[in-house]
């Protein structure tokens, strides 16, 4: 589970900062403030300690549809070009007798993940993938999507990669159009410096900063 020591050891720079054993850089501090406030990040990636007293896991365990585009690099499209990941709603639909009444409102919703170790990598040059389908390959792209999803125009090609979308100043259409969250994502009006600060802060969540 997300709370297990194999997944989260709570040995990040942020944990050391909370314990008074490390100091965040000015950029990291700015990112924490954006995370708590203007960026609306903490609404879902909560900063509160767990009920058992352990540090925050940066998730509220809810489900959301963020309007993430299809990942054109997903090999499933070689087999089924029409494949759509319906998320929680798709699962509930497999048990209509038990959960049928909840299907429609949960189509496209995916579980809010922990942000701990969001930038932890096994080695230099390792490319991470973010969101439920791996569409994003950079935290910078993720943050820019949160900030500008409802501002930038739609890309002409719904299978545009993150890199091409950033270069073109557009975002592809959502993989699932139903139930897209318009509260936590909109025009957040973050500046480029605030976006960069958010990324810098999230990089403080990687375990291994100190020995447990």
Briefly describe each language-model feature range.
Residues 1-212:
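Periplasmic c-type cytochrome electron-transfer domains
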